[in-house]
């Protein structure tokens, strides 16, 4: 499982002109799932993200988690995170999980994040989405389970 995490001042995702998910501040997650991922991977990533200290304390040091600052999470599925661009000029997506499996694991992952005590908004799985955010910092990290 691969997640691109962005600390966000605000974020939203729109499908067909309608906002389907929106947060005032917190973390924007682009979530990629490979066919080898399991629920154990999803739980690991959810716990890691909820407790990752990437928000600044009063002295400007990254010392607080999204839980500590009472932020929210916008989670967006993105199979293209498993695109392999090493050969040719078109990405190969063979490492991305099949849609049925990926959707199940994506939903499970979001529930695991909620179990950590976070409010989670989502995009629409498999849809073409417009994602808008103000990246705070910018702070952008890649979190992987393997």
Swiss-Prot record:
GO cellular component, one term: cytoplasm
Enzyme class, broadest EC rank: hydrolase
A GO biological process held by the record: D-amino acid catabolic process
Motif (Gly-cisPro motif, important for rejection of L-amino acids) on chain: 137-138
Record keyword Acetylation present: no
GO molecular function, one term: tRNA binding
Annotated keywords: Cytoplasm, Hydrolase, RNA-binding, tRNA-binding
Enzyme Commission number(s) from the entry: 3.1.1.96
Known catalytic reactions: glycyl-tRNA(Ala) + H2O = tRNA(Ala) + glycine + H(+); a D-aminoacyl-tRNA + H2O = a tRNA + a D-alpha-amino acid + H(+)
Record-linked CDD domains: Dtyr_deacylase (cd00563)
Location(s) in or outside the cell: Cytoplasm
Main subcellular localisation: cytoplasm
Pfam families assigned to the protein according to its UniProt record, in alphabetical order: Tyr_Deacylase
Domains: entry comment: A Gly-cisPro motif from one monomer fits into the active site of the other monomer to allow specific chiral rejection of L-amino acids.
Free-text function comment from the UniProt entry: An aminoacyl-tRNA editing enzyme that deacylates mischarged D-aminoacyl-tRNAs. Also deacylates mischarged glycyl-tRNA(Ala), protecting cells against glycine mischarging by AlaRS. Acts via tRNA-based rather than protein-based catalysis; rejects L-amino acids rather than detecting D-amino acids in the active site. By recycling D-aminoacyl-tRNA to D-amino acids and free tRNA molecules, this enzyme counteracts the toxicity associated with the formation of D-aminoacyl-tRNA entities in vivo and helps enforce protein L-homochirality.
Subunit structure: Homodimer.
Family: Belongs to the DTD family.
Record's protein name: D-aminoacyl-tRNA deacylase
Upper taxonomic lineage: Bacteria, Bacillati, Bacillota, Bacilli, Bacillales
